[in-house]
């Protein structure tokens, strides 16, 4: 989980939060909370990738796998930033790259095209756009590699696939939905470990937010009215 203590937020005192609450200090603090929420997706990806077998060069990996050049059976993860450096595959799918690609190398070869979400509720237009990009990427990229390829949307923090489907306005069918636990099972990493780390960060965020709020004189005065 990202930490409020590390977030900058708006420094000019003119954030929407300041206009809503009428207090520059509180508005700036709330803008830091929002910045933390936005950065949570990147922090989640970092926690996942730290525990995986990362592909450093997708072109070399696919060529070595195809030719049987010392690629051991296992599960490998390719991030968007790595894929975008590809000289063989990136151009035809430019602008629709997914967050991650999981390659399973066994007696069969599978590529899972995955968009990772920290939340689970999106509007219809955004949901439809996500699906169209995933479908197109899986079709175009899948046609060029010797892997059975399919796409998935993953809502890491929701364990009920039907609720995920509802959150994406029914755009994704159940077979194209992954929970966070399922994603971690595929990658061979501990879902619970990631939850525990994020839970500790959540507790720290709560304590930090309250402490920072109580530094604001107007907040302290308002709190006194209720006790």
Curated annotation (Swiss-Prot):
GO terms for molecular function: type II site-specific deoxyribonuclease activity. This is Type II restriction enzyme HhaII. It catalyses: Endonucleolytic cleavage of DNA to give specific double-stranded fragments with terminal 5'-phosphates. Homodimer. Its EC number is 3.1.21.4. It comes from the Bacteria. One of its GO terms (biological process) is DNA restriction-modification system. Keywords: Endonuclease, Hydrolase, Nuclease, Restriction system. It comes from Haemophilus parahaemolyticus.
């Amino acid at each position: 989980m990202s930490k409020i203590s590390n977030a900058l937020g708006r420094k000019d005192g003119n954030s929407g939060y300041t206009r809503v609450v009428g207090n520059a200090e509180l508005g700036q603090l709330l803008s830091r909370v929002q910045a933390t929420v936005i950065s949570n997706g990147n922090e989640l990806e970092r926690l996942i990738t730290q525990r995986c077998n990362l592909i450093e060069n997708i072109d070399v990996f696919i060529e070595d796998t195809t030719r049987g050049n010392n690629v051991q059976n296992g599960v490998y993860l390719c991030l968007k930033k790595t894929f975008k450096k590809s000289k063989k595959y990136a151009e035809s799918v430019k602008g629709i790259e997914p967050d991650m690609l999981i390659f399973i190398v066994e007696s069969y070869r599978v590529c899972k095209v995955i968009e990772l979400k920290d939340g689970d509720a999106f509007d219809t237009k955004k949901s439809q756009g996500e699906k169209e990009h995933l479908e197109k990427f899986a079709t175009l990229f899948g046609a060029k590699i010797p892997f059975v390829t399919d796409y998935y949307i993953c809502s890491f923090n929701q364990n009920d696939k039907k609720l995920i489907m509802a959150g994406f306005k029914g755009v994704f069918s159940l077979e194209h939905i992954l929970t966070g636990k399922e994603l971690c099972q595929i990658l061979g990493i501990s879902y619970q470990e990631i939850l525990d780390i994020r839970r500790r960060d959540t507790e720290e965020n709560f304590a930090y937010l309250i402490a920072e709020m109580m530094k604001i004189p107007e907040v302290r005065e308002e709190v006194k009215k209720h006790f």
